[in-house]
């Protein structure tokens, strides 16, 4: 005669396993805007309608940092983040990345940060920039601030005081510059950032809005930094490798751009060399990676598999919901960048996705509070998890 307690134990075990299986199929996506939340809901509905395995829920975060906290605490599972946010998520919250965006279908390179100079400037070197003039797209931007200033710190050309006052160190180093936004209250609450960081700025046609962190300053942005060098107001401009080509050969109809030829400009390399504009792959300050989906380490596998199924269904959709289109959401790059061709699986850690050149740059700013020096990363058992992921459904 069977013992009734044995049957009860089996039933309870089955219920527990079913509950665990159901929970494991739920992906809670952390969104930070109304547009992201709506696209997340649309993705969830379309995935359900197509019987895609896994259940997507949309949760709201106040900011990328809030999403990091929610993912760490287990109230969310995934969120797409920029490269600098990925570094913070990994270093401070012990998180990792499951997939990354690819804009060419092959790798996760977003752009190269390069140093542009006029070809006629024969005595320039990135290793000897003291008292030179510089043009930056904007304050606290990856291209215009983080990468070039990180490079100068890492090459011991500038040193920062105990208060980690980077603007003062940069102002003491360069003769004069244009760093739009450096005097804004957001970046200069005490009003004592060096004035020479605005001396290469020109404002608008009426000499107003000088050093403004917007297009009213004509040297704002990457095109503005290029113009700054083209008009001989700066020795070097820090821009993306595509900036020159985006503004020449008739693509920019402003007079300064129409008068500029490719032969008028060159690249300055980190080792002191020079190169032509087409040699950015071997002459750059940093390679900035694309966005990636941040997750807990133990969820790399299941989030990747869910996104792989979603990608197969909606990445190349010509009608209805499209994973890499934001045309219906009132702004570009919602959830994923519109230029994404494919989501790539990240086999290594978040550090491998970010790459050595970019992470080395970011480490130069750790004392500034970009990353909390007290936080520690979680142990990385990614090789074991990737092995398990390959051999499970």
Regions found by a protein language model. Name each.
Residues 238-241, 290:
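Long, repeat-rich segments with strong aromatic
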Residues 39, 68, 88-90, 123-126, ...:
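Extracytoplasmic/secreted cell-surface and envelope-processing proteins
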Residues 88-104, 247-282:
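Ligand-binding "clamshell"
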Residues 101-176:
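A conserved helix-loop-strand patch within extracytoplasmic ligand-binding domains
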